[in-house]
Each structure stands twice: as C-alpha cells, then as structure tokens.
From Swiss-Prot:
Pathway, per record: Porphyrin-containing compound metabolism; protoporphyrin-IX biosynthesis; 5-aminolevulinate from glycine: step 1/1
EC number: 2.3.1.37
GO CC terms of this entry: mitochondrial matrix; mitochondrion
Taxonomic lineage of the native organism: Eukaryota, Fungi, Dikarya, Ascomycota, Saccharomycotina
Protein name: 5-aminolevulinate synthase, mitochondrial
Cofactor: pyridoxal 5'-phosphate
One function term, GO molecular function aspect: 5-aminolevulinate synthase activity
Subunit field text: Homodimer. Interacts with MCX1.
pH dependence: Optimum pH is 7.4.
Length: 548
C-alpha cells in the first residue's frame, strides 16, 4: 500500500501554503488529541487558541477574586461555548427521524417534511430489516426491556451468550466480549493493558478515534504517535526498543472521516518482527469488507475465507499458515453501524477475553445491553454474513457517486473505501452547504468540522448504502453540484491551482484502487460456502467464566 496522503500532506510545504491560502485558520489534525502543529498557519492557530484560553482563564480568575460567592462557573462555560461559536465549530443537531419502512427517508420535526439521509452509519440498512426487527420484537415480548443490571450482579442471558458466540465466529477468534459501546470497549481494553503492563509502550496512529486516544491516556504508559499510515516511521519507533519490552500497536482498518485504509498485513509483520501486540479497530469496516463482513482483516485473505465459510482456513491467500485476521491479537468493532443496533465488542483469544471480563472496569461496572438489542444484533450478523450482495451493492453505489463527482470536478478526498468525503475547506461554508442541501433539496448530509477534522479540511461526509439506488444518487449528485455553484465552492481545479490538499488536486498523486476487485464485486450469495447459512454456533464457556 502506498504511503499515506496525510503523511505526504504533513511534509509538504505546498500543502501548508495551501492551508494558509484557502483557510482562515490552519491547525494540526485535531482528531487525535496529540497532534503537533504543521506549518506557519497551524502555529498561528495554536497561538490564537492559546491566547484565547489565557484570556478566558484570566477572566475566570478575576471573577473568582472579586466575587465573594466563589468561582464564576457559568462565566467559564459561556466563554468556552462562545469560542466554539466564533471559530464555527459549534454544533447544531438536526431533527432527523429515520423511517423503518421508507429507508433511506426520514422526517424532520413535522412528519410531512421528509428528507433523504445520505450520512448515516447504518451502512447496510439492517436497523430496518424485518428479520432484525422480528428478533427484537420476540425477545422484548419474552424478556422485557432491560437487562436488570451488570452481568456480575444480574447475571447474563441467552441473547448475550448467542451474540458473543456469533461475534467470535465472525472474526474466527476463541472468544468475544460485548460492551455498551465500542467507545467503552476501546477505552476499557486499552486502559487495562497499560494498567496491568506497567512497562508497556503503545504506538498509535495519529488519526485514531477519540475512544482509542482516551484509552491510551488512561493506560498511563509511554506512547508514540506515528504519522498516519506511515509504516516507516512506525518501524523506526519500534526498533528503538528491545524486543523484551512489551509493545502494542493500536490502529484502525478504515479511518472514518477520510476513508483511508491501514495496511494490516504489514503492521502484523512489524509486530512479529519487534515483539508487539496488535489492537485493531474495525468499527467502520465490519459488515462492509470480507466475504462474510468481518472487516478489512478478513478481506486481506478474501478467497481463503470465502472458501472456508465459518471455518478457519487451513492456509491464507498466499499459502501461509495464518490469515491476517488470525494474526491480529485484538479486534474491536461496533454493533451500531453496519449491524444496525447499539453496543461494542472485542474479539480475541480465550485468555484475553477472560482477562478483560475479569478486570476491565468499563465492562464490570456497566449495565448490560437489553436482551432485545443483543438478539437484534445477532440476527443482523447472521443475515449479513450470508448476504454478500449487501456489501457488493453498497460498494457499487459508492463507486457510482465517486465517479459522477469526479466528472463534475467535485473534490472528493481520494480513498479506497466506502466513504465519500467531499472537501469544502471552511467550517462556515461546510455548514451552509449542509443547510442548503437539507432545506432546498431535502437531502441530509452533515457537515464535518473541527475537532473531528482539522481546521481547513472541513468536509461533507457521504455514505451510500444498498438502498441508495442510482436514481437517488443522481438527485444527490445534481444537488451537490448546485450547492457548489451557489456557494462558489472550490472544485478540483481550484485546489489544483493552490497546490492541492489531502490528495485533491495534488500533482502526481496516485489514487489507491478500491479494496473490492471486479471479480469480488461479481460474486453472489450462492458463491459463499453453504456452511454460512444458519450454522449451529455453540455458546462460549469464556462468556460465563472458565471452570478449573
């Protein structure tokens, strides 16, 4: 896999110049929480932010010294909120009520005001699928609404056991553990690893999700942040430590705001070479990649997994003993995106799962998800596993939109995944574009601003699903083109004249091929191993506790 476009941007003086010209404020990529400033514009933004914080602190201190009643809490809160309004990062939530029987439609405050949703993470529309809803209805009728407490106090139940067995089977691991969300799963697992391995050194991709950043912070161990997808820098950092020092490489498969993809196999090679564990977040990949929807790690050995079905392949696609998915030590995922439900999980070895179950506070002290939620997620996983057509149609719809945008000069940050990030480059304009789409064209696409992405890289994030037909796509494409004309937003040629940014309009930039090959996209459900249809999946002992 080629070197990251983000690494190239970070080292490019032309890109820094572009940020200074096309954005009122350039800043380090703020999603990671550790980022260092890039270029003069970023330094200026950092200085401005520092002075603003200093002024707010001084005002708070003055209030504290003059008011007998004590600290001016409301003054501090007002100051922080005002800063967000001034830098255009203050967020307004739209009232969007997605309709179960009219996907991808939703209504706003008034039921008559309908819009087409183009930015949902319900990637496969399984939250509305009849089999999923039926499983939830039956379970709630039988077991009620809530779980009654934590698993430690209230015990767990058959839906929980079934779900964890399905997740372990999906990722071909010995066990899985369900959490209330993947944010909690990432935080709980990463923090526990650091708390129990005091000499652990964590190597984290700079674009990792906030949940991973928080987990690494809570781990309270030494950490290194490497440039996004820059494996040369990662290796340099790894080789600076003896092999005897415990290490962990934390990364994602698909990075949600730009659609970039990690080279999982090469990261596993580095982990083997330098004695590191691997922690892979597949949140934006499960359901969408691999013959059975286990994610990008499964996709790396696509044919071996397709042929073996739910069984573990005897060899990988290159004839080796282990698949890439087998080589990854810990895989976290979500039930709340492609699987249409809510919750998160980790899949790993039997011993690791028992360890997390026994020691992770984020698991021990959190009320268990409702039985109906567990049952719905299980139904979704089972359905999507044997329906590769969901994945192929989603990919085809994504390609259709990307191709049309390319022909119109609409700037899409290039990537090999299912994400369609339309570069705007200005927070205020991104919100205006989103507002025009929903109010004039009845299309809902949320603007993505700081701190989710860096200032100067604001965007519209579009996510086609199997339900977004070409007819709906044509309406979207025409609407976005209209918005670009109305707001005079920069197109590819405009970015190119300024030196390019994030792969848009960059001279000599070579875009990566889509993860799905043409032969993979031509597969049908009948091309899958029959053992994926209604398999008997046994409950796991580790879910309840291992008896000695």
């Amino acid at each position: 896999m080629q070197r990251s476009i983000f690494a190239r941007f970070g080292n490019s003086s032309a890109a820094v110049s572009t940020l200074n010209r096309l954005s009122t404020t350039a800043a380090p990529h703020a999603k990671n929480g550790y980022a260092t400033a890039t270029g003069a514009g970023a330094a200026a933004a950092t200085a401005t932010a520092s002075s603003t914080h200093a002024a707010a602190a001084a005002a708070a201190a003055a209030n504290h010294s003059t008011q007998e009643s004590g600290f001016d809490y409301e003054g501090l809160i007002d100051s922080e909120l005002q800063k967000k309004r001034l830098d255009k990062s203050y967020r307004y939530f739209n009232n969007i009520n997605r309709l179960a029987k009219e996907f991808p439609l939703a209504h706003r405050q008034r039921e008559a005001d309908k819009v087409t949703v183009w930015c949902s993470n319900d990637y496969l529309a399984l939250s509305k699928h009849p089999e999923v809803l039926d499983a939830m209805h039956k379970t709630i009728d039988k077991y009620g609404c809530g779980a009654g407490g934590t698993r430690n106090i209230a015990g767990h139940n058959i839906p929980t056991l079934n779900l964890e067995a399905e997740l372990a089977t999906l990722h071909k691991k010995e066990g899985a553990l369900v959490f209330s969300s993947c944010y909690v799963a990432n935080d709980a697992v990463l923090s526990l690893l650091g708390q129990k391995m005091k000499d652990l050194v964590i190597f984290s991709d700079e674009l990792n999700h906030a949940s991973m950043i928080v987990g690494i912070k809570h781990a309270n161990v030494k950490k290194h942040i490497f440039k996004h997808n820059d494996l040369n820098e990662l290796e340099q950092l790894l080789q600076s430590y003896p092999k005897s020092v415990p290490k962990l490489i934390a990364f994602e498969s698909v990075y949600s705001m730009a659609g970039s993809v990690a080279d999982i196999e090469k990261i596993c090679d580095l982990a083997d070479k330098y004695g590191a564990l691997t922690f892979l977040d597949e949140v934006h990949a499960v359901g969408l990649y691999g013959p059975h929807g286990a994610g990008v790690a499964e996709h790396c050995d696509f044919e071996s997994h397709r042929a073996s079905g739910i069984a573990t392949p005897k060899t990988n696609d290159k004839g080796g003993a282990k698949t890439v998915m087998d080589r990854v030590d810990m895989i976290t995922g979500t039930l709340g995106k492609s699987f249409g439900s809510v919750g998160g999980y980790v899949a790993a070895s039997r011993k690791l799962i028992d360890w997390f179950r026994s020691f992770a506070p984020g698991f021990i002290f959190t009320t268990t998800l409702p039985p109906s939620v567990m049952a719905g997620a299980t139904a979704a996983i089972r359905y999507q596993r044997c329906h590769i057509d969901l994945r192929t149609s989603q990919q085809k719809h994504t390609m259709y939109v990307k191709k049309a945008f390319h022909e119109l000069g609409i700037p899409v940050i290039p990537n090999p995944s299912h994400i369609v990030p339309v570069l705007i480059g200005n927070a205020d304009l991104a919100k205006q574009a989103s507002d025009i789409l929903i109010n004039k064209h009845q299309i809902y696409v949320q603007a993505i601003n700081f701190p989710t992405v860096a200032r100067g890289t604001e965007r519209l994030r579009i996510t086609p699903t199997p339900g977004h037909t070409n007819d709906l796509s044509d309406i979207l494409i025409n609407a976005v083109d209209d918005v670009f004309n109305e707001l005079q937003l920069p197109r590819v040629r405009d970015w190119e004249s300024q030196g390019g940014l994030l792969g848009v309009g960059e001279s000599g930039f070579v875009e990566e091929s889509n993860l799905w090959t043409s032969s993979q996209l031509s597969l049908t459900n009948d091309d899958l191993n029959p053992n994926v249809r209604d398999p008997i999946v046994k409950q796991l002992e580790v879910s309840s506790g291992i008896k000695q």
